Amino acid sequence: QKELVTHVYHTICHSRKLFIEAPTGAGKTISTVFPAVKAVGEGKADRIFYLTAKTIARTVADRTFDLLRERGLHFKTVVLTARDKICFMEESECNPDSCPYAKGHFDRINDAIFELMTTKEHYSREEIEACAQKYKVCPFELGLDMSLFSDGILCDYNYVFDPNVKLKRYFDQGEPGQGYLFLVDEAHNLVPRAREMYSASL
């Protein structure tokens, strides 16, 4: 693990790419997250994107940040959940006429953001849903807004690589990915996903 941590840190310092292949249980998550967090703390990067194809991998990464926080780390992270999974309505129609959470959303969103910012460092799906229910705001939009105040964003590949879904607030301004670290979990899964993203169907 020590050797892996060193390689990851040097890769970040020299703005390079690193591919890691190691067996399950080798400690890849902590060995990549720790040097990335260190680099952000030293001002070598602004934000970490931890990208996964599966929810379980996101959960493991989430727990890794929690372990570091238990040992004194102050680092805000948000877990982004797909709109159709986190929406409170049976059918997600994002307009004020059909969704009570969309109606008046912008009147209440600042209070919701302020509460999370001042009371939490970990914005999990459960925390976001609870706060969204309390202030009656859209949980999906609340998660996206909390990402602006987070040092680490845990999300699906789509939010970075899919041209239709990518987070435009980060990737449509200036040089793409400037100041960001991308930790891509199980990168072999990205190939078939990328094919889907860039394939059209009639």
Place the predicted regions along the sequence by residue:
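Conserved pre-motif I regulatory segment
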Residues: 1-21
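Walker A/P-loop
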Residues: 14-34
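Generic beta-sheet signal
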Residues: 16-20, 46-48, 152-155, 180-182
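Alpha-helix capping and helix-loop boundary segments enriched in small/acidic/polar residues
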Residues: 20-27, 52, 56, 198
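Signature of the SF2 helicase/ATPase Hel1-core->accessory helical subdomain module
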Residues: 32, 59, 63, 135-152, ...
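A substrate-engagement module of RecA-like helicase motors
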Residues: 44-153, 158-161
